């Protein structure tokens, strides 16, 4: 029988000092012996996805205490990728994932907490907490802040839906008037919550459902809706049950590594491909799998991408649907239901509620359930009122979207495409693979060949795009922006958005060893591995070289002879300590970022730290 971790600090005469300090936090004699559960919050006023979380930790804590536990809350940092985008701030985004994971480990292990409720939401916070949870392997439940309502405004006498990406594109489009750009900016992000499309934050919150670590509805129920409160109340109660199951009944099925098994990771990736999730999810699932000591690699993702169809299409791949529409159609469970009926899921998995996949679908799939309260929950919709308050409205759709032929979520027979929304490409400058969000690529450019325009920083590429130096047919190469080379593997949302602003969204490709925002669409290929700074062949591409992209056949090729590439590599190596570094880039890199770069692996490994350099 495992001993409560917290007993280390609450029992024994030699722990009198620790108990004295616990008493100073409000604990009493009656609390010593109860499980201490960390409420891992991420409230900050910097991030709309987290601005409403201040009181939600207290909500969870009250339920923990009522159920017989002791709740202790702390906060992690949270970087807003949208605000950090397009300047030096983006260097810090991906490294913040490791800091979040480490800080959770530090707090939980330093204070010997027994379990956790993770209140996450945005891009690097959910992955960081997920990595920590699987590293620590103590009972955990995730409950996120929820998606933002889609923006809406009237243009040309028509009400249209908007999101953050629309504001970026229109802000750089010289054909858009100042007044229209201002109107879109003011309408794009109307409420608290994670940005309203299938961007990285919402993708990851959906994947925690598929991994079994959060409750049904977690990925899609709006931040503003009153129904979301129940997820927080349930999390506080349920975590005490899970904790007691493990520590008092020796039930290891309550642990995250047993819930988020390899079968669950395969299900999560299957969901990701089917819903056209952010390419960043590949990085984060690979990183989380390593923390769980699961053998889950790019090869596994490639195999899944070749057999899973696209069953859901959401912004930025279409402006017709946002997360509020996914929820109306049944949310994550609705997509999993269609995948299950197609025979594409591992059924022998359980979630934090203790339900198997078939049991979860029977109870929560809107196409199967007989429970009116579940159907009512999935009718929770937007209010269209600007607010930063959680649970501030209770509007409902008149009906569910259960149209699996033409609705937001499709059945296998009516799939958006037989190929899924993400694909892994391989070639002579991406030997370890690269990723493309096929859900956002127009059918006309699934095969594309063009001359390279090479840039060694995102900034130079942006200047070239806006300066008219990139023309239709070009393949924009942005290198030395990988985990080590950036450092920090910047997102390239501004370059891809500005290509659209300049009318080149369907006329150019962009390839990088950096990554993309979940808001990116178009022929945007990222995570090229190995990265340039690690000696990857992307560092050998020269202006004018022809690049051939073949998504249907999963290929990407630099059309230069092996002999020429060998000569270029020899010349690069001859630069000595300057080899595999940008030639004409001035960038101030802090000590903290240099420390990150010194241990960072390429994207095909999840951009995690290279443990071989640490020994032990």
Swiss-Prot record:
The modification N6-carboxylysine is found at residue 124. InterPro entries: Dihydro-acid_dehy_C (IPR042096), DihydroxyA_deHydtase (IPR004404), DiOHA_6PGluconate_deHydtase_CS (IPR020558), ILV_EDD_C (IPR056740), ILV_EDD_N (IPR000581), IlvD/EDD_N (IPR037237). It comes from the Bacteria. [2Fe-2S] cluster binds at residues 122, 195. This is Dihydroxy-acid dehydratase. It comes from Escherichia coli O7:K1 (strain IAI39 / ExPEC). Mg(2+) binds at residues 81, 123-124, 491. Functions in the biosynthesis of branched-chain amino acids. Catalyzes the dehydration of (2R,3R)-2,3-dihydroxy-3-methylpentanoate (2,3-dihydroxy-3-methylvalerate) into 2-oxo-3-methylpentanoate (2-oxo-3-methylvalerate) and of (2R)-2,3-dihydroxy-3-methylbutanoate (2,3-dihydroxyisovalerate) into 2-oxo-3-methylbutanoate (2-oxoisovalerate), the penultimate precursor to L-isoleucine and L-valine, respectively. Pfam families: ILV_EDD_C, ILVD_EDD_N.
